[in-house]
């Protein structure tokens, strides 16, 4: 935690001459950043979403999509960036470990507003900070590796806006069959590869099975074949 405090104290913010909004959290695991980023970015013209591209096979900066046109495959972008690109038909999505380079690239492409997915810890970037606070917070208040926080819990006070799950935003999940909202077959399996999959249980009928893989799991053809064979009498 001391290292985090020192980094924040020494950081000199850089102004980029473009509105930059960070949607982040300070806990380990999912908190709803991606769907909220999609919702916000969809409200603006010439928006750009920048993220690291967790789990991708590539390194460096890649423009995943430009005004909704997909430019790379999911191996290069990572699954989260591809979800953003497919969801935002009029936006640009960039992956890069170096957010500063990505911001400069977004400006070069003519973007007028930038959303940083999980950008709270980028202290050197002058930005408007939105922090999401889940309803189920870690009971251990220490930072990694001892506890469940990535930043000190007191850093919530440093957000420009703090959004509390349950009052400021809610998760609304609809399970669909064949792209249409309808009643699911009684023998259905839900396959997940997200952080904290148990949070889905409250939205599921009790007779649906759930198979959980690690967050951002890269499914192989063998995985899919094994699941289909094991649950051949089930819908997915």
What are these language model-derived features?
Residues 7-68, 72, 171:
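Walker A (P-loop) phosphate-binding motif
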Residues 54-168:
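Phosphate/Mg2+-binding loops and adjacent switch elements
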Residues 107-112, 229-235:
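Glycine-rich phosphate-binding loop signature in dinucleotide/nucleotide-binding domains
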Residues 138-233:
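C-terminal accessory "lid"/substrate-recognition subdomains
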Residues 1-18, 28, 218-230:
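N-terminal leader/targeting and accessory segments in enzymes
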Residues 38, 42, 86, 105-108, ...:
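Short, well-ordered alpha-helices that flank and scaffold nucleotide-derived cofactor binding pockets
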Residues 48-50, 130-131, 187-191:
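Conserved beta-strand elements of the Class I
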């Amino acid at each position: 935690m001391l290292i985090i405090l020192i980094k924040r104290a020494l950081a000199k913010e850089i102004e980029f001459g473009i509105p930059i909004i960070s949607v982040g959290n300070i806990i380990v695991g999912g908190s709803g950043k991606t769907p909220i980023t999609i919702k916000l970015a969809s409200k603006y013209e010439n928006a750009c979403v920048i993220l690291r591209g967790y789990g991708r096979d590539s390194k460096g900066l890649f423009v995943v999509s430009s005004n909704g046109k997909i430019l790379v495959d999911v191996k290069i972008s990572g699954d989260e960036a591809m979800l953003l690109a497919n969801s935002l038909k009029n936006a640009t999505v960039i992956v890069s470990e170096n957010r500063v380079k990505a911001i400069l690239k977004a400006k070069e492409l003519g973007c007028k507003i930038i959303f940083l997915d999980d950008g709270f810890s980028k202290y050197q970037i002058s930005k408007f900070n939105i922090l999401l606070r889940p309803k189920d917070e870690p009971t251990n208040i220490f930072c990694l590796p001892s506890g469940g926080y990535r930043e000190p819990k007191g850093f919530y006070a440093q957000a420009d806006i703090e959004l509390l799950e349950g009052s400021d935003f809610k998760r609304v999940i609809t399970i669909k069959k064949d792209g249409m909202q309808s009643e699911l077959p009684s023998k259905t399996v839900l396959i997940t590869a997200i952080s904290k999959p148990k949070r889905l249980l409250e939205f599921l009928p009790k007779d649906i099975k759930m198979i959980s893989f690690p967050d951002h799991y890269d499914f192989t053809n063998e995985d899919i074949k094994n699941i289909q064979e094991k649950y051949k009498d089930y819908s997915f």
